[in-house]
Swiss-Prot record:
The keyword Methyltransferase does not apply. Produces ATP from ADP in the presence of a proton gradient across the membrane. F-type ATPases have 2 components, CF(1) - the catalytic core - and CF(0) - the membrane proton channel. CF(1) has five subunits: alpha(3), beta(3), gamma(1), delta(1), epsilon(1). CF(0) has three main subunits: a, b and c. It is a peripheral membrane protein. One of its GO terms (cellular component) is plasma membrane. GO terms for molecular function: ATP binding; proton-transporting ATP synthase activity, rotational mechanism. It is found in: Cell inner membrane. Belongs to the ATPase epsilon chain family. This is ATP synthase epsilon chain. It holds the Pfam family ATP-synt_DE. It comes from the Bacteria.
Length: 141
C-alpha cells in the first residue's frame, strides 16, 4: 500500500475535499509543485488553475481553484482557496465565453475601466479554459 498524506481543500463556501492522497499537484506562484507524504513544510500562494489529487489506488481527482494558498506539513496538506470547483463541473463553452468577454473588456476601455481587475478576470477565465482543455485532452472527454 502506498504512503499517503491527509489533504483538505477549503474555500469560503466550506470544505470541498478531505481525505488521504498519495500526491497533490498544484500551480504555485514560482512553478508547479508535487507534494508527496513527508514533504518538507512550506507555505506558498497558488495561481488560478487545476489542483490534481492522486488518491489511494492511483485514482486522480481534479479541482479548479481561482487562487489561494497551500500549506504543507509532514502529515497534512491544506489548500485554502478563494473559490473551488470540481473540474468535471466546469463548462468549456462558459469558460470560452468568459475569456472572450474579458478580452473585449480589455479592448473597449470605458470611463470607469480598471486594468488590474480586467486582467485578473482574463487570467482566471483563461485558467479555467486551460483546465477544461487539459482534462478533455487527457481523458478524451
Amino acid at each position: 500500500m502506498a504512503m499517503t498524506v491527509h489533504c483538505d481543500i477549503v474555500s469560503a463556501e466550506g470544505e470541498i475535499f478531505s481525505g488521504l492522497v498519495e500526491m497533490v499537484i498544484a500551480h504555485g506562484n514560482l512553478g508547479d509543485l508535487g507534494i508527496a507524504p513527508g514533504h518538507a513544510p512550506l507555505i506558498t500562494d497558488l495561481k488560478p488553475g487545476p489542483i490534481r489529487l492522486i488518491k489511494q489506488g492511483g485514482e486522480a481527482e481534479v479541482f479548479y481553484i481561482s487562487g489561494g494558498f497551500l500549506e504543507v506539513q509532514p502529515n497534512m496538506v491544506k489548500v485554502l482557496a478563494d473559490t473551488v470547483q470540481r473540474a468535471a463541473d466546469l463548462d468549456e463553452a462558459s469558460a470560452q465565453a468568459a475569456v472572450l468577454a474579458a478580452e473585449k473588456a480589455l479592448n473597449e476601455k470605458g470611463a470607469d475601466f480598471d486594468y488590474g481587475s480586467a486582467t485578473a478576470r482574463l487570467a482566471e477565465a483563461a485558467a479555467q479554459l486551460r483546465t477544461v482543455q487539459q482534462i478533455r485532452k487527457k481523458f478524451g472527454g
